[in-house]
């Protein structure tokens, strides 16, 4: 499978990036298991048994309707530098698991997001805690990759999907996603600052299925210089449309280029992603 091979190569590049953590212009962190240290937990988000549980469930494990939770790394991340004009290349890898009591009606989904420092939860349900029904403007200053399990007719494609969101819950680019209820999903998201290309790939190892979506996003025109990175998730507003939203592990690395070697590394990532996208077209 071309996409799985491509994803593995991107994971290797991501790990190479992480090994350069001694570099002064690189920030990286890894949660193999979660505790509350270094996390900002909002609303219903909790840590339990090493898992980051974004939305609420009852003691018997049944998800709660109308739940909203968010969790962000506690240290702000510099995405671009207004003085020099440089933009960070970054990558994140995480494993999540969504499980609905009724596999035919999960809701609403989970998203990885970059938000302004100090951002507070927004609307429940289909807005995934990141946006609200009254504001589709640039003032949101939010970029997200959503893993959307429920069709909201006002803005969603008809199928479950992975979408890239820029200041709005209406994705600028989507790809259909065969949601695997209760099965782990492994995600890798990369941003190449030399091309502005944001690429998100998801693999369900148990199903041997994989999905990819990409789009060019100029982060300097969307985000503030410093952001918080993390997750937001919601359940449906009625008990027949709910799911658990758990993140099992998470790594992140970002680096603002300051030398030729960094530029060569970015070019390598850019060429690899471009070839893979062409092969899958």
UniProtKB/Swiss-Prot annotation:
Superkingdom per UniProt: Eukaryota
Activity dependence on pH, as recorded: Optimum pH is 7.4. No activity between pH 4.0 and pH 6.0, 80% activity at pH 8.0 and 20% activity at pH 9.0.
GO biological process, one term: defense response to bacterium
Molecular-function annotations in GO: carbohydrate binding
Keywords, ordered alphabetically: Antibiotic, Antimicrobial, Fungicide, Glycoprotein, Lectin
Cysteine-cysteine disulfides: none
Gene3D superfamilies (UniProt xref): 2.60.120.200
PANTHER family: CONCANAVALIN A-LIKE LECTIN FAMILY PROTEIN, LECTIN
Record note on quaternary structure: Tetramer of 2 alpha and 2 beta chains.
Protein name, UniProt field: Lectin alpha chain
Source organism per UniProt: Lablab purpureus
Lineage start: Eukaryota, Viridiplantae, Streptophyta, Embryophyta, Tracheophyta
């Amino acid at each position: 499978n071309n996409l799985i091979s491509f994803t593995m190569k991107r994971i290797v590049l991501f790990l190479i990036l992480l090994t350069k953590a001694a570099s002064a212009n690189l920030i990286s962190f890894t949660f193999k298991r979660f505790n509350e240290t270094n996390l900002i937990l909002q609303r219903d988000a909790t840590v339990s048994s090493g898992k980051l549980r974004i939305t609420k469930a009852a003691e018997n494990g049944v998800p709660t309707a109308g739940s909203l939770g968010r969790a962000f790394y506690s240290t702000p991340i510099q995405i671009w530098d207004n003085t020099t004009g440089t933009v960070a290349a970054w990558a994140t890898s995480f494993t999540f698991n969504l499980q609905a009591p009724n596999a035919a009606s999960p809701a609403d989904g989970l998203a990885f997001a970059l938000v302004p420092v100090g951002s507070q939860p927004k609307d429940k349900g289909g807005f995934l805690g990141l946006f609200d029904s009254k504001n589709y403007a640039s003032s949101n200053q939010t970029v997200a990759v959503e893993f959307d399990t429920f069709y909201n007719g006002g803005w969603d494609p008809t199928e479950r999907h992975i979408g890239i969101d820029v200041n709005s819950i209406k994705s600028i680019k989507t790809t259909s996603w065969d949601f695997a209820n209760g099965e782990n999903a492994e995600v890798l998201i990369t941003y190449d600052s030399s091309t502005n290309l944001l690429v998100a790939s998801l693999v369900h190892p148990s199903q041997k299925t994989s999905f990819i979506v990409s789009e060019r996003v100029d982060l300097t025109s969307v985000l503030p210089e410093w952001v918080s990175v993390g997750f937001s998730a919601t359940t449906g507003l009625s008990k027949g449309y709910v799911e658990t939203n758990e993140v099992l592990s998470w790594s992140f690395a970002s680096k603002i280029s300051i030398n030729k070697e960094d530029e060569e590394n970015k070019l390598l990532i850019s060429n690899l992603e471009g070839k893979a996208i062409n092969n899958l077209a």
